[in-house]
A protein has these predicted regions:
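FAD-binding core/adjacent interface of flavoenzyme oxidoreductases
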Residues: 1-11, 27, 33, 77-147, ...
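Residue-level detector of alpha-helix initiation sites
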Residues: 14-15, 38, 115-117, 156-157, ...
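A Rossmann-like FAD-binding core segment of flavoenzymes
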Residues: 69-98, 103-104, 166-264, 304-313
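FAD-site-proximal beta/loop scaffold in flavoenzymes
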Residues: 116, 121, 126-143, 239-286, ...
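Internal hydrophobic alpha-helix adjacent to the cofactor/substrate pocket in enzyme cavities
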Residues: 163, 291-311
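Conserved small/polar residues in nucleotide/adenosyl-binding loops
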Residues: 314-321
């Protein structure tokens, strides 16, 4: 097993990780990045990105991630394949295991492991992810201007995205599996008073219809078992995201949903020298540009933290008491 020590270790790739790498490399922190299971993050499944500055004609998600990686490498980032499988933040220096092939200690660690959208698990949904099925209304809603779409979900996020889509699309149909919402009263009221939003309760999505693009959704009333087809050109899944933080449980403070807690106005965590950027610490905005912004912040925070330490002296760090999330 390889054993190395570095000034800055970045765990995860994507807009947050690559931006952190660009800034850390330019600050001569000589960052090493392990890209994880999905190099590039959720954008690797995105065909068109039209809302990231600098791409006036839009760009495909994988191409954008390739551009970011190239920029990070140009400034000296050591980008490596590999998945972090265990962390030891109570040790000094902090230690990270990369599968069974590397043991990395680092003065600073930037966590940019992102979050994973929850999906329905339908084969037709997977097949049409690039053809009209999306987990981000803000990202992709514009493509369905003046069209009819459906959205699956019952919480605040689903209601918020339905309201957003109602301003763009001619009609939005919400498919709610149970007989009521899980959202706040204010969000429910907003949905129910929007004229072009229709809500179908006790409704399950059986299949996404269409060969190359979404042409409709087969739905079933779970009270009567009656199936019917709903004609739409886009289907938005808004049943939540799961932060990729399993390996950090018991090592760093997480909130009740598993997102890494950061000190407001910074990317600092409760562990000195450990920073978090992107969707792994953001369940509100979840945009490529905001992830990139926090990636920048994390590198600047790491640089300033190192400068404040002077010659690094390693002392024992206390683990958080809330080991279960």
């Amino acid at each position: 097993m390889i054993k190395e020590h570095h000034k800055c270790l970045i765990i995860g790739a994507g807009p947050a990780g690559y931006t952190a790498a660009i800034y850390a490399a330019r600050a001569e922190l000589k960052p090493v990045m392990y890209v994880g299971m999905q190099p590039g993050g959720q954008l690797m499944d995105t065909t068109e990105v039209d809302n990231f500055p600098g791409y006036p004609k839009g760009v495909e998600g994988p191409q954008m991630m390739e551009d970011m990686r190239g920029q990070a490498e140009r400034f000296g980032t050591d980008v490596r394949t590999g998945v972090a499988t265990q962390v030891f933040f109570n040790e000094s220096p902090k230690r990270v295991l990369i599968e069974d092939k590397a043991e990395i200690t680092a003065d600073t660690i930037i966590i940019a492991t992102g979050a994973t959208a929850k999906w329905l698990g339908l084969p037709s949904e997977e097949r049409l992810k690039s053809g009209g099925v999306s987990a981000c209304a803000v990202c992709d809603g514009f493509f369905y201007r003046k069209q009819e779409v459906a959205i699956v979900g019952a919480g605040d996020t689903a209601c918020e995205e339905a309201t957003y889509l109602s301003k763009i699309c001619s009609k939005v149909t919400m498919l709610v599996r149970k007989d009521g919402f899980r959202a706040s009263k204010a969000m429910v009221n907003r949905v129910m008073t929007t004229p072009n939003i229709e809500v179908l309760f006790n409704t399950e999505t059986v299949e996404v219809l269409g060969a190359q693009t979404v042409e409709g959704v087969k739905i079933k009333n779970n009270q009567t078992n009656v199936e019917s087809n709903l004609v739409v050109t886009g289907l938005f899944i808004a049943i939540g995201h799961t932060p990729n933080t399993d390996i950090f449980k018991g090592q760093i403070d997480l909130d009740e949903n598993g997102y890494i807690k950061t000190i407001p106005g910074s990317t600092n965590t409760n562990i000195p020298g450990v920073f978090a950027a992107g969707d792994v610490q953001d369940h509100v905005y979840r945009q490529a540009v905001t992830a990139a912004g926090t990636g920048c912040m994390s590198a600047l925070d790491a640089e300033r933290w190192l400068a404040a330490q002077g010659p690094v002296s390693y002392t024992h760090l206390t683990l958080p008491t809330n080991r279960e999330v």
